[in-house]
Amino acid sequence: MNYRDLFVGLDVQVPLLDGRQVTYVNLDNAASTPSLRHVADCVQNFLGYYSSVHRGMGFKSQVSTHAYEQARLATLQFVGADPRDHICIFGKNATEAINRLSRRFPFTDDKNIILVSMMEHHSNDLPWRAVGRVVHVHLTPDGCLDEEDFDKKLARHAGRIAMVAISGASNVTGYVNPIHRLAEKAHKAGAQIMV
């Protein structure tokens, strides 16, 4: 199987300054990953029914609302969350979602520290500064998360850390964080983790 066949737009020709046309190379996956063909097909098939969600009684609005709610349930099931105890809130992109979470998270005066790694994009750093006290976790000289520093800061601020905000992978180096291990440590310290 050729994995390139699974995506839309990988063979798009773009102009260079000298007038030549070349195949586009996408180096911006952190912001806008190419769509999967299957997803594009599903969107195309649904467009005839597309309407406002939770805002109308017409047939198309009811179909759109049902599809939206089914997507929420599917997302909760995918992450193993019980819909009786959790809710899925969609955002346009990671920046909007992180801003929403930062403004709605129940920080308290006693528990308002957010651990943020130094590898984070501003969209996962700046929103937290507006709502609590950000403590940055350092990186190793080769750009990896300094897990020893992470552990020290968890211990130093024990009981006061509300949130750990960390990327699954660096959009600069490609380093993949040990998320499961970090989540276990965060939860053991009484903090939530946002990946």
Please identify what each model-predicted range represents.
Residues 1-195:
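Pyridoxal 5′-phosphate
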